[in-house]
Amino acid sequence: VDWVTEDCKSHFSGFSDNLIVTPEIAYQNLPEFKSCKGKTLMLIGGGPSANNDWEQNEYDFLWSINHFFRNEKLKDKKVDLAMIMGEPDIEAADFIDYRDKHQTMIGFEIHDRWLNYKFDNYDKYFCMHTRFYGRLGAGARMKIFAAHLGFKNVLFTGFDGPEAIFEGDHAFEP
C-alpha cells in the first residue's frame, strides 16, 4: 500500500520523482545514498551533549539537523546530510552560505510549512518521511533512515531529551 507518494509529490514536486517507498519510510533516492551501505554515521542533534567531545570518533558520514550550521563545532565542518524541520529559515544567508559551501544534502519531511513552498534550484534537496512522524523526534527518524540506507554503525550525540532544550540548553541556538 502506497501511503505517502501523493503527499511527497504535492509538497516536493521538484525532488520526489524517484521515491523509494516501504511500509515504514519513503525517500527520494539520491545517487549519494548508495555509498552509505556498510559505513559508519555520526549523527549530531541539538541537545547539549552535541558540545561534548565527539570528534575523536571515527566515522564516514556526518549528519545533523535544523540549525546545525550555527554550532561552533559544526559551522566549519562538512555535514553531509541535514534534515530541516519547520523552524529554520532556509532563505537565511548563513544557511545558504553553509549549504552552498559544503554541498550538504538537505532533507525535508512532509509538513504544512512546505506545502506550496517555492524551493530554490539547489540540486541536493530530497524528501524523507517515516510513518513515525509526530511520534518520535527527528533524530530517531533519522536513525530509521540511516538503517534503511544500510549504515553498519550509527553513533550519535545531542539527543538529550526535550527537558534540556525547554530549559534553554540547546547546542544550535542561543
Where are these regions (language model features)?
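Metal-ion/cofactor- or nucleotide/acyl-coenzyme-handling active-site neighborhoods
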Residues: 1-174
